[in-house]
Amino acid sequence: MMIAALLAVSLALPLASRAATSPSQPNFGPNVYIFNPSMPQSQIQAAVDAVATQQVSNQFGTQRYALLFEPGTYGTSTTPLTFPVGYYTSVAGLGQSPGDVVINGSIDVYNQCLGSGCVESNNFCFNTTPPGTPQVNCNASDNFWRSLSNLTINEVNNSALGCEGAAEFWAVSQASPIRRVLVNGLVTLFDFCSGPAFASGGFIADSQFAGSTVINGSQQQWITRNSQLDGWTNGVWNQVFSGVVGAPAQCFPGSLPACGNNPYTTLATSPVTREAPYLYLDSNGNYNVFVPAVQHNSVGTTWAAGPTPGSSIPIQRFFIAKPTDPAWLINAALLFGFDLILTPGVYNLDQSLVALYPDTVVLGLGFPTLIPQNGNPSMIVASDKGVLLSGIIFDAGPKNSPVLLQVGLCGICHNSHSASDPSGIYDVFFRIGGAEPGKATNSLVVNSDNVILDDIWAWRADHGNGVGWTDNTANTGLIVNGTNVTGYGLFVEHYQQYEVIWNGNGGTDIFFQNEMPYDPPSQAAWMEAPGIDGWAAFKVANNVTSFKGYGIGSYSFFDQGVNIFAANAFEVPNALPPESLNDLLTIFLSTSGSGGILNVVNGIGGSSTIANPDTPVTVVSYP
């Protein structure tokens, strides 16, 4: 019916006009800013500052931006280009390699200060009276939905900014990745210029940090994958390194004398990776999207010894969608074989977007946000092979959706041929409530085999709009039915039943961060089964015979004033091979909470309650 309707419409002209026909300058819309080195630096500075002023406190706004830099050098050691990055802002170089775009200066994320209801910039509130009054309660725990990629930063100490001109600051929490970045100079992952500076990140991949030790500081947890370090200062609860040159040595739990309270989970190589696709300009000034090749047992960056292996797709093969485009038009483009670029904005979808064909690329610029309007999934990936999705937010809509993103049509139809050309989901984030009321039974369902999940945050909102136990309802953040699925950096929080269900064999998860729901109104309302309190955060199905997990943590903060308990943070088959799970932990987050987690995994490991707040309860390996 849908295909017949589409074919009945004269589509050739609209599609041709919306596919990129000008190699020099495709129309990415008004919220994609493209800078080049010939522009006056004052003009660039004014533009990026204006975006930051709007976005730095715009947590649940509808504005979205991409700031793109053509190959060349920006700023100098005496006149650095320095600017903050706010919500829903992606900053990226347009070179084929990170060294093609050089920023002399810094691109920063600072704490937000909540002392007087306003947001901090350079350690002071924008609208403080009198000007310059220091703020209190400054932290990075809500610094979400922003990104930095594909460029080099030569960090320049900018004395005009005071303390916050002393480093490259990336004080973020979830959904704020760094990819394909080289930083020469001091990098800090927390803002030490104002306190208490809590931070709850984070994700780095395919990046290098040279000339200084990366400051982890207060970051509770972090995953760094396939990168190169000159040093790393410390751990807090769950710092994970996979395929990282210069990573700290394996040391878990942090309470061991040899660890010095620095817990590190370190894997020498990453089992299977495929870096995220990215937009770039070639030497002839033509736009392309680069698709990196699959790697096995890899270590370090893909660009250390030359250009990243892979292939290019010319921009003419992409349909460049705008938020005002109807879903049928975007689907028509996908039906006719176009790849898809989603430009910044909010897309209200009255039907699911369907990626039909193998090797389709769907690339988001500036955190495009998809919201289903009729209880439909926002997107269905129909092919099991080589489909890549990157840089997209999936919001729940006003009518309950069974799932927001479905990857693969059949959870029991296994396809080994996809192993050489796996699908990948990169920097894809899910949200139930917060920005607006919404409901969805499940957020992400992966039916295809061999899929790579690379930085996923599925969040049932604990603050914002439409938040409440019976308001933003959502059972499960991630269900994996496919075999040999690999996850790096899975952040899944506050769902109302199992937060992750892993049904497929041969799976691997490297890093998991979870907060259980804050708001169960009673123990009776939150029971896995009679006699089993609560729900496990991560459930490996009873019929699974092979699964590996590394660096997996779950935290509790039940804030309804009644004792709520979860019997286990993790439930897995006892028949898994020995040491299938490694470096597990639970945390009781705050003495203002109640209840807690009674066991780490399958009835062992001890409890996290008010008796041991902010103290990891650990299991080194299981079974």
Predicted regions and their residues:
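Glycine-rich beta-solenoid repeat tracts in large extracellular/virion proteins
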Residues: P80-P84, G99-D142, S159-Q174, V187-F198, ...
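Right-handed parallel beta-helix/beta-spiral solenoid domain characteristic of secreted/periplasmic
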Residues: F28-S42, Y88-E164, F318, P323, ...
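Eukaryote-biased recognition of C-terminal alpha-helical segments
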Residues: G593-P623
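Fungal secretory targeting signals
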Residues: M1-R18
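Right-handed parallel beta-helix
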Residues: Y87-Q96, A140-V156, A175-V187, A199-G211, ...
